[in-house]
Amino acid sequence: MAKKVEAYIKLQVAAGMANPSPPVGPALGQRGVNIMEFCKAFNAKTESMEKGLPVPVVITVYSDRSFTFVTKTSPAAVLLKKAAGIKSGSGRPNTEKVGTVTDAQIQEIAEAKAADMTGADIEAMKRSIAGTARSMGLVVEG
């Protein structure tokens, strides 16, 4: 018989840097999950990723307090900021531009996020990411 799902917990945790401090500790502790077991498993799974990059994770907690988790790709905004080499987006994206990204960079981000996005094809995903870039105050070249 399948285990009964008790909860889904969605978090964003820095790759390779999960530890029992907030937000991980309180979110898992109130569900009775072994926090250190999650931290070790998460850090092992994300060790190949760039350290410190935020990684969305969905943790499924079962009634016997066991868990499984699925990592997603980093948010498009984070990947765009990294590609453009900026710290944050523009407060006034329509008037104040803070950086540029090329079509090739957008293609690369779309391919990386393809597994998590619901676009019909790669071109639709590229348009979506280009829209995110424009809303952050980035100029899209190409």
UniProtKB/Swiss-Prot annotation:
BP terms from Gene Ontology: translation
Top-rank lineage group of the source organism: Bacteria
InterPro entries according to UniProt: Ribosomal_uL11, Ribosomal_uL11_bac-typ, Ribosomal_uL11_C, Ribosomal_uL11_C_sf, Ribosomal_uL11_CS, Ribosomal_uL11_N, Ribosomal_uL11_N_sf
The entry's keywords: Methylation, Ribonucleoprotein, Ribosomal protein, RNA-binding, rRNA-binding
Gene Ontology CC, one term: cytosolic large ribosomal subunit
Post-translational modification: One or more lysine residues are methylated.
Pfam families: Ribosomal_L11 (PF00298), Ribosomal_L11_N (PF03946)
Summary of the function given for this chain in its UniProt record: Forms part of the ribosomal stalk which helps the ribosome interact with GTP-bound translation factors.
Name the UniProt record assigns to this protein: Large ribosomal subunit protein uL11
